[in-house]
Amino acid sequence: MQKAWGFLSDPKNLKTITPDYMGFDILSGANRKMFAGQIIQYILTPILGIPFRWVTEITHVEKGHYFVDEQRFGPYTFWHHKHFIEEIPNGVQMTDIVDYKLPLGFLGRFAHWLFVKNKVKSIFEYREQKLESIFGKYE
């Protein structure tokens, strides 16, 4: 449990569990272990190599159990991401709950239907595979 929490609560490891095609780089704020109020700035190129700046704030941390990040500036109108980590028999389970909304009204809803929903899903599937390769798969 401590090993998993140590990895997941270190912002520098986010690049490790993000697909390369996202062009993800941390610009600032990842030089300390996670804490409530921490601001982390990123740049990523998820669509056609177009760079997006993304600023998130870690709003809640309960060491060893969960943390929450919220977008302060970036591609979404709203982004609220809860990461729960719990010890289970013979392992650790991580659960992500993400609520988000795209800008631009109908166009945003259309983009979500057309590709964003599947892109977000594929990113979290990639993370699951990476975490399994790092920590092992729970059977």
Where do the protein language model's features map onto the residues?
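A short, structured loop/turn motif at beta-sheet edges
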Residues: 1, 33, 59-66, 84-93
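Hydrophobic ligand-binding cavity/cleft-lining segments
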Residues: 1-35
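A cross-taxa feature marking solvent-exposed loop/turn segments within ectodomains of secreted
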Residues: 17, 49-51, 78
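Amphipathic, soluble alpha-helical interaction motifs
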Residues: 17, 97, 133-137
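Glycine-rich portal/gate segments that line the openings of hydrophobic small-molecule binding cavities
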Residues: 25-73, 126-139
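Beta-strand/loop substructures that line and gate deep hydrophobic ligand-binding cavities in soluble
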Residues: 71-122
